[in-house]
Amino acid sequence: MPNPFNQQVIEEFRANGGRVGGYFEGARLLLLTTTGARTGAPHTTPVGYYPDGGERVLVIASAGGAPQHPDWFHNLLANPRLTVEDGVFIYEADAVVLEPAERDAVFARAVEADPGWAEYQAKTDRVIPVVALHPIPKDGPPHVNAGSMAEALKVVHDAFRRELRLIRKEFTAAVGTDGTRTPGVPLGAQLRVNCLTLCQGLHNHHTGEELGIFPLLADRHPELTPALDRLRREHERIAELLEELRRAVAQDQQDTDPGRVLSQVERLTTELEAHLTYEEEQLIPLLTSPGASR
C-alpha cells in the first residue's frame, strides 16, 4: 500500500488524466506499478520522468538523496517488467538500468534541466541510478485511459496541450525578455529532447488519425468531408512547423537563436491550439452519437 501522500497523488493523477496539483503541479509524472521483490505484490508509486526523444522514457531513482535506493528500484532489479501510466496511455514496459557512461551523460542532462538532481546526489554516497523504460510492443491500438473514442481524443489532445505549455515555460526560462538567452540558463540538451519528443508524438498522432479515425468517420458521415479536408490541410501545416522546430533545436547549441526558437514554439502553440479545438468541435459530437464505438 503506498504511503498516504503517494496514495493521494495516485488518486489525483488517475482522476485527472495525469494532472496533479500541489508539490507536483506542472511536473512530468508517471505511475509505475512494479512487482514487489520480496512479496510479489503490485506496488504503485508516482515518479518524475524525462522524455528521451523516442519511445523510451527515463526515470531517476533519487529517493530525494536518501542513503538507500527507493523500493520501486529494488523491485525493478528483481522484476524488470512493469506497468506504466502516463495519464493518457497504460502500457507494459521493461526497465533497463543505464550503464555508467550513458547514466552519467543522461544524469548531466537532467542536472542541466533541474539542478535539484545534483543536490540529491551530493546528499548520498550511492550513485543515483537512471532507468530507461522501454514499452513492450503490442498488437492492436494502445490502451488509452478513456471510456470512449470521444473521450480518448480529448485526453490525447489535452496531453499535447499540457506538454506544449511545459515546453513554452521551459523556453521562457531560458530566453530573456529581449529575445536573448538568460545569463546562466543555457538552452539545454533536455529541452531540445523535450521538443523533439513532442514533434515525434504529434507526427505519430496525426498519422494515426489519417489512417484510422478519419477514414472511419468519412465512411459513416459523408457530410464531414469538407471538415476532414480542412483537418488534413492543417496537419500538413503543423508538419511544416514541426519540421522547422526540429531543425532549429537540432543545431549546435552555440548556433541556436533562442529567441527565434521561442517564436517558433509560440507560433506552433497558436496554430495547434486552434487545430485541436476545431477538430474536437467537428469530431467529438459524431464520436459520442449512438452507434459510435471505441
Where are these regions (language model features)?
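Short, charge-rich binding segments
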Residues: 49-51, 74-75, 84-87
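Hydrophobic pocket/interface hotspot
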Residues: 40, 76, 120, 275
